């Protein structure tokens, strides 16, 4: 029997939104057996541009796309939705400190959390793309007290996909040969792209790629700084690759994970790996019959433990900063 899902997308007229919506409407996130309503949220000045995007969506005549709502009111956007994809966020501008960015986005995500809490469907799931996504997710979660904390996620799949691509290039293999590539922690330059537990054609990545210097001193910094490299090269942040990773994430959160693999997503920690309960931290996860769980039996060497500590410390600092601002 055909299924139906209502999906809110914030920042819908932005570059990521533009790269995301057509693929959402064609069934690439929820499957070809699921019809979709799109609730599109934008700030008032961007509504004319969003109407242009809606015109294009209509012109595609997607069989799975049923209804579209265009609004600048979060209460309307989140009304009765099953998924809220929080893509829109205030960009970091020249001279802006990270604290300023947290404050500016904090008010946006606090308001959206409240609106989701009051208006969304009882089974709503929230996926945050807008940066700093871990802490934006934390803010939304803490402003939606009636929604179970395990329904909130932030995106680290883009980092995972970047890492898989780099390992495949270095090893001279196809992308599907690389599995179990884990991103730990924050979606920032402190993230830990964990090649030690990755596999290539079923073997440990460190056995296939024997160049330890490359793994430690090239691979990790390249993944950590990849977003900045894209901005430098094209004058704008990652859009198509971010939209692609968001679709991958939603698919992985819904569908059962293959037995020989896992995926990375940031979610509300419950004390796993020594991470403070309530922090939004990226872990290796699996989905089984619609239930998402963190893989808990992974052991870290000394290097890995240090990397986990670095990214955990940063997330604690961000949490403390938004707490001081009264956002959580």
UniProtKB/Swiss-Prot annotation:
Residues that, per the record, bind NAD(+): 11-17, 105, 112, 129-131
Membrane-crossing segments per the record: none
Positions of the catalytic residues: 187 (proton acceptor)
Catalytic activity field: (S)-malate + NAD(+) = oxaloacetate + NADH + H(+)
Any one GO MF annotation of this record: L-malate dehydrogenase (NAD+) activity
Enzyme nomenclature, EC number: 1.1.1.37
Keywords for this protein: NAD, Oxidoreductase, Tricarboxylic acid cycle
Similarity-based family: Belongs to the LDH/MDH superfamily. MDH type 2 family.
Protein name: Malate dehydrogenase
Natural source organism: Coxiella burnetii (strain Dugway 5J108-111)
Primary gene name: mdh
